[in-house]
Curated annotation (Swiss-Prot):
Name listed for the protein in its UniProt record: Snaclec A6
Record organism: Macrovipera lebetinus
Cellular component aspect of the GO annotation: extracellular region
Keywords of this entry: Disulfide bond, Hemostasis impairing toxin, Secreted, Signal, Toxin
UniProt keyword Secreted present: yes
Length: 156
């Protein structure tokens, strides 16, 4: 009987150590985990370029958030909404998408270099940087002036 309990306890310890005990186990304090990545909302007003630079300085291949699915859209929206402090600049939050003019052909990719596999535009406009809009509960992408300062979310 004692040996059976010991073996069962040992298996439980191995299972818990392999499965982890919390959602944020691999993320730094203050960061949130989702499908192998860590996310953090920053209540700092920065231009798109400065926000991207700030995210790269966070380490571990950090960039402005890239959104690859509806599931990730919902995760980011639910992370942003309660964590943005209300100011006049909280109507938009930068994401890592910017249209770049390469040889007069407009191409877009995430700031981490990954391709766009999922799209959630409000409407196409000529402005080159994208963000999430509060009016859509931070679930739709909107074109914004890259030089305006907004809050942002980093992903590592």
């Amino acid at each position: 009987m004692g040996r059976s309990i010991s073996v069962s306890f040992g298996l439980l310890v191995v299972f818990l150590s392999l499965s982890g005990t919390g959602a944020d186990q691999d993320c730094l304090p203050g960061w949130s985990s989702h499908e192998g990545h860590c996310y953090k909302v920053f209540n700092l007003d920065k231009t798109w370029e400065d926000a991207e630079k700030f995210c790269t300085e966070q380490g571990n291949s950090g960039h402005l958030v890239s959104i690859d699915s509806k599931k990730e859209t919902n995760f980011v929206a639910e992370l942003v909404s309660p964590n943005i402090k209300e100011t006049r600049r909280t109507d938009f939050v930068w994401i890592g998408l910017r249209a770049e003019d390469k040889r007069q052909h407009c191409s877009s990719e995430w700031s981490d270099g990954s391709s766009i596999n999922y799209q959630n535009w409000i409407e196409a406009e000529s402005k080159k940087c994208l963000g999430l809009e509060k009016q859509t509960r931070y679930r739709k992408w909107v074109n914004l002036n890259c030089g305006k300062p907004y809050r942002f979310t980093c992903e590592i």
